[in-house]
Regions:
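A generic tandem-repeat structural signature
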Residues: 1-38, 43-44
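OB-fold/S1-family RNA-binding modules
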Residues: 1-6, 31, 39, 76-89, ...
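Secondary-structure junction/capping motif
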Residues: 6-11, 66, 93-96, 100-103, ...
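Short, acidic/hydrophobic/Gly-rich beta-strand patch recurrent on exposed beta strands
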Residues: 6-10, 43-47, 57, 91-95, ...
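Short, charged/polar, Gly/Pro-enriched secondary-structure boundary elements
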Residues: 12-18, 97-103, 175-182
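A cross-kingdom feature marking solvent-exposed beta-strand/loop segments within repeated
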Residues: 15-26, 51-73, 99-102, 134-149
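A generic local secondary-structure boundary/capping motif
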Residues: 21, 31-33, 67-69, 80-81
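Surface-exposed interaction/gating patches
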Residues: 26-50, 62, 78, 85, ...
């Protein structure tokens, strides 16, 4: 019969890992594919069969109740290496690629009516996500709930008035239930290596940053 080569999938995967893992260090931006979603985070395949976790608090600045609010299985995304432990286990982050406060705020203007998603309902107000890395606060309401789509009026973008504060004041015009499928995020950074990332403006009283 004809000669054939018997390849061990495990051996190929092991060789791939041996060559790939040394290239992964904190700050490296890479491609990933979502494999499954858990309440605590999102598992992704980063190549060579390597599974890595993006913790829920590292997915975006705007808080979500479950990773399914941001991702879906088989979705291709970008991620950045946050840490690699002594066993080669890799933890990733995602929010650093979604733009700073100023970059996201620049997409909007005072007086605009835009779409958002209600992410949190508190006694002092309702947080509405405008982008994954930007949320605004509306007056308290007891007739809305987390997960609803909302039409909001941008009352003020605080940097126009007080650069030290990162606030967007909103008025909820309408809130309604709607099925939506997570879309590919808008990435402000898609490749390279990050040494640090600062979300807050230079003049902000509160420093929000990631050091890799």
């Amino acid at each position: 019969g004809k000669p054939y080569a018997l390849l061990s999938r495990r051996a190929v995967q092991q060789k791939c890992m041996e060559e790939y893992l040394p290239t992964l260090s904190p700050g490296v931006i890479l491609d990933a594919r979502v494999t499954h979603l858990e309440p605590f985070g999102c598992f992704v395949d980063i190549g060579c069969g390597i599974s890595s976790l993006i913790p829920i608090d590292a997915i975006s600045v705007s808080r979500i109740s479950h990773p399914k609010d941001r991702f879906k299985v088989s979705q291709d995304i970008k991620a950045v290496v946050r840490s690699v432990d002594e066993n080669g286990r890799i933890t990733l982050s995602h929010k650093e690629l979604l733009g700073t406060w100023e970059e996201n705020a620049a997409l909007f203007e005072n007086g605009q009516t835009v779409a958002g998603i209600i992410r949190s309902v508190e006694e002092y107000g309702v947080f509405v996500e405008l982008t994954p890395n930007l949320a605004g606060l509306a007056e308290p309401r007891d007739d809305v709930y987390v997960g609803q789509q909302a039409s909001v009026f941008i009352k003020s973008l605080i940097p126009d008035l007080i650069p030290e504060k990162m606030k967007v004041k909103l008025i909820i015009l309408d809130a309604f239930d709607a099925q939506y499928s997570p879309e590919r995020p808008r990435y402000f950074i898609e490749n390279g290596i990050l040494s640090h990332w600062r979300y807050s403006p230079d003049s902000a009283a509160k420093l929000i940053e990631t050091v890799f």
